[in-house]
């Protein structure tokens, strides 16, 4: 079959783009990739059609060549097509380079055994360096664009295999001084420098002269697949964000370069920074992030290299660069920014946020930067929200919120105002223009707009968003809280239809505000006349706030309202309030009301519910009523106890405490998976047990809450039923589990019983590291061993052997965790301790009665546990 024409390809590509999966599943789908590669070499197709084909291959490379062999063949064909292009200028050269790179990356074919990879890498390096271009790669005017494209392709390969181009650092460093595109070369050099520093710091090696240019014309390879394989993807953030101090300590190694390497490194970074002004703002931000991240992990290297750039960047109008400055400040603090720099930057942000012509997104950016401003010396604890110390009254006066602002901008400014009020500890009552006065004025204005009858729902939503923000920031500010509660009460009085908003607010606010707000709303709801049009909203509010309240006024309101409840919706709302009162025990007044409702309500469903509630109130105590009508997460099975009236109604609702009908024990443990699993065995003793639910509670706060385990049925005489309980330790320590069983009997009764507590031993938390490739065990263990210090601790313990030898002890207790064994003399053992610790053991040559054990761990708190465990092995 010959090559397709332009119209045929246009129809084929249109059908593919309409539904790629459906097209590939059809008859023409199998040949699409092969035909595309073949027709790229056809002279009958125009260059514009070939551009369309290559564009499709860039967008859908993973669908056209989904596996490594297909991607390898496609990349080889694309490179052959590139070589066969005529010498005249062509738009295909850049697209062919991009398509070959994309095919290798998306098909996961990039590697040392890939022939296309070994062809593409030297070609891209030659193009990026400006040499080996030759006449076959276009005219000199085209080669500048090819050089930029080659740098982009190399950058993509480096991102997929970090450390791959570490050997080309010296060559790449020499490129910015030559004639050629500055931006792609600078970004590529910064990326390779960043990745090389991280990879070398992981391995503990220095830069080893990598920054010095070498001559690769002799055929030596400047790329290193070994470094790329050693990269650990979780160490590299996926976006330009700075880690917290804790994240840095856990995941970012520190490199201490030699004096020669430090000198070359400073020169390379200074070279990139000196030409950074020639880059676009987005490219400059990426460059600063890469260099800042890399230098942050260098011991003894102060960030003074960035100082000359601050003169230019502190006055920039580009938001991306301003964000980069704040990122540098968050990373280096007072090591790079003086107090004058900090004051200037904060004033710059404050004045920028006051510009009247700013669009809302830009306005929000400035406000967010002020709210999250990284101070040199913050006074409060880490993670606590606070206004910047240098943000004085004069600076923030222009940042006060106004009702004329966009809602998102108003909330952001209100957030800042709340932080200023939190810092204003004096709270002078005669202060008429202070932060608290501004806050009360804004809240009053928002409440007045929300109270307009028939006003837009958006105004009410904004008012409640602002109220929640104030309660969240000023929990302990009694004056503001009192003002807010009084204003919300007036708002409900004016517009009861906002009851759903009030219910949602009560669910979200802190307990300090919830209780006084609940009392005020209860008073407002019961004070309204029962025949008003807002009756349904008052009933909805009472269903939320009536529980635990004084019932006399509430019952009086309900008795008056019952006469006006004429439809099914009002009946249900009225019964929901009765249900809320039932949960706190009810009383004679409630019983009389329920009897009246059971006789007077017009629909049968309402009468049945009222009769049911009356029976519950008559037969159950207050505590049982609370369990029966208010099922919680702690007792989910009790909701099923509600059933129709019958002779055994009262008995069926009672959960009886009995002796344990089952036997629960700890079985043999299996060390595998991401989290420890406690293997349990359960057996029924004398009678069948149905719908069994086992609930576990951990003493203390050592573990995350444990999920309940459900078993449909257990019968006596059956083999032990295995259960697997997933443990999520907050620290690697043994624990004691209290167990309760909730179950149903053959007679249909619900019972509960307490079981003997279970012990989680220290060894039950042990987890192995993933299986390693053969031959890499010793290097892996040495890397873990070296990474424990200086943050961790090292110790030596004597492990008695008893009657068994060293090999038997290791085989019985430590076999899953052995990284490398050289019996009978040496065992290297690596154990993961959740959530994020490890324990490393070196068992040396056994003596007559024991074996010396050298151990390291990154968690000093486990040392006593390790000693007790090793000394107790011989006694098992």
UniProtKB/Swiss-Prot annotation:
GO terms of biological process kind: endosomal transport; protein transport; vesicle-mediated transport
Top-rank lineage group of the source organism: Eukaryota
Signal peptide: none
GO CC aspect terms: AP-5 adaptor complex; AP-type membrane coat adaptor complex; late endosome
Alphabetized UniProt keyword annotations: Protein transport, Transport
PANTHER family tied to this protein: AP-5 COMPLEX SUBUNIT BETA-1
Subunit structure of this chain's protein: Probably part of the adaptor protein complex 5 (AP-5), a tetramer composed of AP5B1, AP5M1, AP5S1 and AP5Z1. Interacts with ZFYVE26 and SPG11.
Reported function: As part of AP-5, a probable fifth adaptor protein complex it may be involved in endosomal transport.
Protein name: AP-5 complex subunit beta-1
Taxonomic lineage of the native organism: Eukaryota, Metazoa, Chordata, Craniata, Vertebrata
Gene: Ap5b1
């Amino acid at each position: 079959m010959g090559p397709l024409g332009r119209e045929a390809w246009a129809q084929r590509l249109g059908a593919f783009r309409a539904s790629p999966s459906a097209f590939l599943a059809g008859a023409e789908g199998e040949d699409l990739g092969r035909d595309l590669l073949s027709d790229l070499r056809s002279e009958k197709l125009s260059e514009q059609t070939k551009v369309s084909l290559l564009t499709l291959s860039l967008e859908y490379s993973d669908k056209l060549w989904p596996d490594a062999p297909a991607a390898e063949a496609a990349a080889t064909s694309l490179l052959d097509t590139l070589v066969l292009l005529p010498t005249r200028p062509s738009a295909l050269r850049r697209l062919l380079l991009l398509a070959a790179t994309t095919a290798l990356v998306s098909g996961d074919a990039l590697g040392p055994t890939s022939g296309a990879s070994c062809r593409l890498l030297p070609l891209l390096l030659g193009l990026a360096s400006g040499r080996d271009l030759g006449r076959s790669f276009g005219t000199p005017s085209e080669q500048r664009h090819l050089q930029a494209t080659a740098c982009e392709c190399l950058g993509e390969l480096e991102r997929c295999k970090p450390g791959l181009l570490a050997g080309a650092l010296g060559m790449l460093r020499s490129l910015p001084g030559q004639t050629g595109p500055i931006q792609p070369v600078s970004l590529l050099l910064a990326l390779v420098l960043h990745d090389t520093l991280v990879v070398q710091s992981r391995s503990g090696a220095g830069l080893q002269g990598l920054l010095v240019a070498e001559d690769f014309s002799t055929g030596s390879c400047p790329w290193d697949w070994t470094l790329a394989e050693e990269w650990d993807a979780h160490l590299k953030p996926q976006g330009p964000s700075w880690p917290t101090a804790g994240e840095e300590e856990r995941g970012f190694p520190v490199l201490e370069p030699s004096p020669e390497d430090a000198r070359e490194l400073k020169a390379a970074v200074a070279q990139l920074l000196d030409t950074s002004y020639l880059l676009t703002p987005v490219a400059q931000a990426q460059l600063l992030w890469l260099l800042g991240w890399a230098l942050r992990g260098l011991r003894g290297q102060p960030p003074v290299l960035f100082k000359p750039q601050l003169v230019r960047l502190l006055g920039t109008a580009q938001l991306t660069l301003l964000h980069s400055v704040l990122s540098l400040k968050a990373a280096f603090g007072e090591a790079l920014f003086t107090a004058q720099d900090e004051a200037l930057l904060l004033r710059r942000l404050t004045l920028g946020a006051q510009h009247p012509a700013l669009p809302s997104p830009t306005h929000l950016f400035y406000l967010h930067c002020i709210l999250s401003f990284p101070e040199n010396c913050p006074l409060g604890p880490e993670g606590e929200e606070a206004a910047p110390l240098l943000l004085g009254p004069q600076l923030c006066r222009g940042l006060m919120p106004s009702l004329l602002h966009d809602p998102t901008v108003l909330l952001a400014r209100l957030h800042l105002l709340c932080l200023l009020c939190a810092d204003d500890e004096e709270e002078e009552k005669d202060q008429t223009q202070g932060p608290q006065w501004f806050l009360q004025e804004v809240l009053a204005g928002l409440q007045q707009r929300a109270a307009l009858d028939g006003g837009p729902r958006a105004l009410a939503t904004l008012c409640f968003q602002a109220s929640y923000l104030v309660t969240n920031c000023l929990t302990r500010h009694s004056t503001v809280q009192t003002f807010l509660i009084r204003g919300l009460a007036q708002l409900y009085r004016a517009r009861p239809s906002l009851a759903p908003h009030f219910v949602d607010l009560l669910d979200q606010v802190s307990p300090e505000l919830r209780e006084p707000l609940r009392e005020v709303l209860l008073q407002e709801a019961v004070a309204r006349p029962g025949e008003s049009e807002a009756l349904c909203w008052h009933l909805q509010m009472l269903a939320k706030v009536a529980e635990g309240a004084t019932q006399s006024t509430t019952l009086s309101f309900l008795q008056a309202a019952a006469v006006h409840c004429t439809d099914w919706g009002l009946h249900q709302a009225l019964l929901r309030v009765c249900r809320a009162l039932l949960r706190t025990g009810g009383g004679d007044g409630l019983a009389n009301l329920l009897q009246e409702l059971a006789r007077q309500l017009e629909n049968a469903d309402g009468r049945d519910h009222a009769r049911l509630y009356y029976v519950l109130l008559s037969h159950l105590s207050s505590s049982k009523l609370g369990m029966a009508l208010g099922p919680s997460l702690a007792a989910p099975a009790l909701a099923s106890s509600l059933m129709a009236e019958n002779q055994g109604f009262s008995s069926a609702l009672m959960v009886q405490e009995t002796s344990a009908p089952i036997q629960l024990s700890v079985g043999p443990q299996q060390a595998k998976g991401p989290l420890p699993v406690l293997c349990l065995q359960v057996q029924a003793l004398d009678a069948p047990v149905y719908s069994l639910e086992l609930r576990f509670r951990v003493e203390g706060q050592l573990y995350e809450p444990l999920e309940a385990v459900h078993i449909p049925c257990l019968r006596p005489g059956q083999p032990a039923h295995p259960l697997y309980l997933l443990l999520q330790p907050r620290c690697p320590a043994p624990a004691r589990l209290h167990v309760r069983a909730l179950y149903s009997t053959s007679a249909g009764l619900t019972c509960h019983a307490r079981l003997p507590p279970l012990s989680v031993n220290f060894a039950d938390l042990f987890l192995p590291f993933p299986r390693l490739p053969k031959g890499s065990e010793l290097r892996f263990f040495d890397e873990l061993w070296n990474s424990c210090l200086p943050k961790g601790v090292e110790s030596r313990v004597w492990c008695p052997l008893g009657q068994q030898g060293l090999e038997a002890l290791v085989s019985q207790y430590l076999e899953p965790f052995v990284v490398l064994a050289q019996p009978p003399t040496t065992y290297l053992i690596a154990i993961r301790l959740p959530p994020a610790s490890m324990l490393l053991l070196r068992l040396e040559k056994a003596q007559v009665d024991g074996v010396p054990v050298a151990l390291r761990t990154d968690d000093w708190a486990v040392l006593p546990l390790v000693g007790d465990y090793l000394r107790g092995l011989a006694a098992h």
